């Protein structure tokens, strides 16, 4: 048996993935949650309902031409972070595991992002090393000091936002510009058309950041009649400079460790290009950077392989 099924549910996306450990191929099926125009997200109860409905369709599509007897294990995200008191429902994964009589391994959504970024960037060597990992999305903006132990990661919070998450700042700015949620890709396209110079001054407290100013300043620029292209570029520049200053301070604190960036915001090419140039940072391809279950599926493979190697 060489196949590993991964399931992940986040604030914005329902994701499934199938990893073939013989060929190294990763196949994904994912779908955004249905958010009404002008809204910033869903209530938790509504999100759970839609995740459950979408998972059935996605899994059926993912496995339609697959010999399911070759699935060795299922892996699912059961909590946002690898810390106590953190929880996400994974009912579908439990039902499938029981029905198929195969192991179920659970990991955190954050571990999944880190794993996907390492897999996608072909840096799986870091599963056994120390590094600094940023997880920057609509639900999280933080950096952790990560220690890989082969089948997962122990993490120590190193820095985080004190108010808005980066993805929230992007979406709120985008909605003020009349864009459709989630606004990241549209905001990036507008920003790329800007030709004016932009200066920003990020706000940090130690290694932690404050991003609520992005929303307020973007609104001020809109009220002043600045173009959507300029406002979009300003928003992304502010976030890029904030993350850059956080990175600089963390390297001063922890030393010259490898830098990994994951999460939907880090699939933005403007930010990505800047960080690759400044810090030689590790990024995953876009399909492994935004919310996905590929990292969860790969963690399931590593866990299964570790357990059965020791037997």
Q: What is each residue range found by the language model?
A:
Residues 1-2, 106-132, 298-302:
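Conserved phosphate-binding catalytic cores of ATP/NTP-utilizing and phosphoryl-transfer enzymes
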Residues 2, 6-12, 17-19, 27-28, ...:
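A short helix-loop
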Residues 2-76, 80, 109:
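N-terminal beta-alpha supersecondary unit
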Residues 76-101, 269-277:
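Short Gly/Thr/Asp-enriched flexible loops that form oxyanion-binding sites at enzyme active sites
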Residues 76-79, 137, 260-268:
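Glycine-rich beta-strand-to-loop/alpha-helix junction loops that act as flexible
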Residues 88, 104-112, 135-136, 161-164, ...:
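Active-site nucleophile and cofactor-binding loops and adjacent substrate-binding regions
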Residues 113-117, 284-311:
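Glycine-rich phosphate-binding/hydrolytic loop that grips phosphoryl groups
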Residues 189-259, 265-276, 280-283, 301-310:
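A contiguous, well-structured pocket-lining segment that forms one wall/lid of small-molecule binding clefts
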